């Protein structure tokens, strides 16, 4: 278990930087990631989440776990095992409905695990 306090602005910046990093990409992928970096997390779609590197998806899910329903950061113990359990469920839910709100899909799956 890891004790972590997430800062929303720092997390958003990290998501944007990591989403935009990488080697050579097709122009459409660059455009998609640039558009994603401009969105608030509450505006992200499952399609945006699906476009992330597989290895980064648990990090995004962990960040979502670190916020309560009011969008405020919490001083909480992060359940790494829980994140590893719920991440595949969120990935599958987002594959089923790519146009759906990522935040809402993540919250629904998190309620099943936490």
From Swiss-Prot:
Q: Which organism is it from?
A: Brucella abortus (strain 2308)
Q: What is the lineage of its organism?
A: Bacteria, Pseudomonadati, Pseudomonadota, Alphaproteobacteria, Hyphomicrobiales
Disulfide feature: 46-94
Q: Which UniProt keywords apply?
A: Chaperone, Disulfide bond, Periplasm, Signal
Gene3D superfamilies in the record, alphabetically?
Answer: HNS-dependent expression A
Q: Which residues form the signal peptide?
A: 1-26
* Cellular component annotations (GO), alphabetically ordered: outer membrane-bounded periplasmic space
Tagged with keyword Signal: yes
Q: Which InterPro entries match?
A: HdeA (IPR024972), HdeA/HdeB_sf (IPR038303), HdeA_sf (IPR036831), HNS-dep_expression_A/B (IPR010486)
* Keyword flag Signal: yes
| Protein's recorded name | Probable acid stress chaperone HdeA
Tell me where it resides: Periplasm
Gene that encodes it: hdeA
Q: What does this protein do?
A: Required for optimal acid stress protection. Exhibits a chaperone-like activity only at low pH by suppressing non-specifically the aggregation of denaturated periplasmic proteins. Contributes to acid resistance. Not required for wild-type virulence in the BALB/c mouse model.
> Pfam families of this UniProt entry?
HdeA (PF06411)
Q: Which family does it belong to?
A: Belongs to the HdeA family.
User: What's the chief localization of this chain?
Assistant: periplasm
User: Single Gene Ontology BP term?
Assistant: cellular stress response to acidic pH
């Amino acid at each position: 278990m890891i004790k972590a306090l997430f800062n929303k602005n720092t997390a958003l910046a990290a998501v944007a930087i990591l989403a935009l990093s990488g080697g050579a990409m097709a122009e459409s992928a660059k455009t998609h990631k640039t558009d994603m970096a401009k969105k608030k997390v509450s505006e992200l779609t499952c399609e945006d989440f699906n476009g992330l590197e597989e290895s980064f998806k648990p990090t995004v899910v962990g960040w979502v776990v670190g916020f309560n329903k009011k969008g405020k950061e919490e001083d909480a113990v992060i359940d790494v095992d829980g994140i590893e359990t719920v991440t595949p469920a969120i990935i599958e839910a987002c594959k089923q409905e790519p146009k759906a709100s990522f935040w809402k899909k993540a919250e629904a799956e998190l309620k099943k695990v936490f």
